[in-house]
Amino acid sequence: MIIVIIMPKNENNPNIKNNNHQSPKKRIALTAGTFDLLHPGHFNTLNFAKKHADELVVVLARDETVKRIKGRRPVIPEEQRKIMIETLKPVDKAILGSLTDKLEPILSVKPDIIVLGPDQTTYQLEELKNQLLERGFKTEIVKVEEYVKCPFHSSYDILKEIIRRWCNKEIELK
């Protein structure tokens, strides 16, 4: 036997969900980078950003953009980097950057805070703030000041170590 109780909508009844009541707006943080060969500095920036928001969106530099800026493509293709970043604990969403307008992902996400890594060169804090204001968007922008110093604190250092260990040596596959 099934008993169905139909209750009239009652604003004063705490057992009835009020669909008109909006939950508080989630604070969104955005950070951006290549995130090619992951290292402790990446995790430091991601954790810092997540501490400042409820949701963290990461914008990944496109392969073509990295080639244009750094003169080389990333080791790991953009779609694979996106998958890797999406699986990291502090990250709620990863998106690929724009090929033509570096501000487009920011204007699309509309973050409450933008977190720049300590070695961020694509975005300079004041320049970014001014460019966003010119487009009618105001947000908080902070730069991670603490730089994680360890043997492999950059993708470049990881690549140098791989070359040092493996260059001119026959690689044994087991």
From Swiss-Prot:
Which Gene Ontology biological process is one annotated for this entry? FMN metabolic process
Q: In which pathway does it act?
A: Cofactor biosynthesis; FAD biosynthesis; FAD from FMN: step 1/1
Transmembrane segment boundaries:
none
Its domain of life reads Archaea
Required cofactor(s): a divalent metal cation
Q: GO: which molecular function terms?
A: ATP binding; FMN adenylyltransferase activity
Q: Say yes or no: keyword rRNA-binding present.
A: no
The similarity annotation says: Belongs to the archaeal FAD synthase family.
**What function is annotated for this protein?**
Catalyzes the transfer of the AMP portion of ATP to flavin mononucleotide (FMN) to produce flavin adenine dinucleotide (FAD) coenzyme.
Q: Name the HAMAP family on file.
A: FAD_synth_arch
Q: What is this protein called?
A: FAD synthase
Q: What is the lineage of its organism?
A: Archaea, Methanobacteriati, Methanobacteriota, Methanomada group, Methanococci
Q: Which gene encodes it?
A: ribL
